[in-house]
């Protein structure tokens, strides 16, 4: 099955036994993770197809999937966050200088993350310069933009937020 290129039908084309049929779609509830799933790609496809969907739009999805640009926006609006340095693939031409810049801004241990990889792909924790170099090489395998971020020691609190007509208070879960 695939989304019909005819935007007036707002449907899926289902192929079976040498023929096809159209299945109307009222709304799509994307339950996807990572690249192409939550980075604005599939949301853009839905918008081009004029099929309504649940969740964030293209821009919000794309920006929130990109750790570097999310940090830049959060910094711009003045929200406290872990210190960070953006390292680009092009910085690898002068990697020693790039690592000097990271070490000048952020004390060890340093978390090194591909900017747009999902989950924990390519994420490393560097305790020293040798580990920082290895972490940068691992991260660049997954994305050309890399986020180097200070370690924050403290409690991590998770809290699910569900929309409803009446609200029930749920406890936050500490990890």
Predicted regions, residues:
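Proline-rich intrinsically disordered, low-complexity coils
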Residues: 4-5, 52, 107-109, 169
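Active-site nucleotide/adenylate-binding loops and adjacent lid/helix of ATP-dependent enzymes
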Residues: 18-23, 61-155
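Conserved small/polar residues in nucleotide/adenosyl-binding loops
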Residues: 168-175
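ATP-binding N-terminal substructure of ATP-dependent carboxylate-amine bond-forming enzymes
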Residues: 1-59, 63-69, 76, 87-100
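Short acidic-glycine loop/turn motifs at beta-strand connectors
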Residues: 163-166
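Aromatic/hydrophobic pocket-lining residues that form π-stacking "cages" and hydrophobic walls in ligand
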Residues: 42, 135, 168
């Amino acid at each position: 099955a695939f989304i019909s290129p005819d935007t007036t039908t707002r449907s899926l084309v289902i192929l079976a036994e040498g023929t096809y049929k159209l299945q109307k779609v009222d709304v799509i509830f994307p339950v996807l993770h990572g690249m192409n799933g939550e980075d604005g790609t599939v949301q853009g496809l839905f918008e081009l197809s004029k099929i309504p969907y649940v969740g964030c739009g293209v821009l919000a999805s794309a920006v929130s999937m990109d750790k570097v640009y999310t940090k830049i926006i959060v910094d711009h609006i003045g929200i406290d966050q872990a210190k960070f340095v953006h390292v680009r693939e092009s910085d690898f031409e002068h990697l020693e200088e790039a690592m000097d810049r990271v070490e000048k801004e952020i004390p060890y241990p340093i978390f090194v993350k591909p900017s747009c990889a999902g989950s924990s792909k390519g994420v490393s924790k560097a305790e020293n310069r040798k580990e920082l170099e290895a972490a940068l090489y691992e991260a660049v395998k997954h994305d050309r933009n890399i986020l180097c971020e200070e370690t924050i020691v403290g409690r991590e609190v998770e809290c699910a937020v569900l929309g409803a007509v009446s609200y029930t208070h749920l406890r936050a879960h500490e990890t």
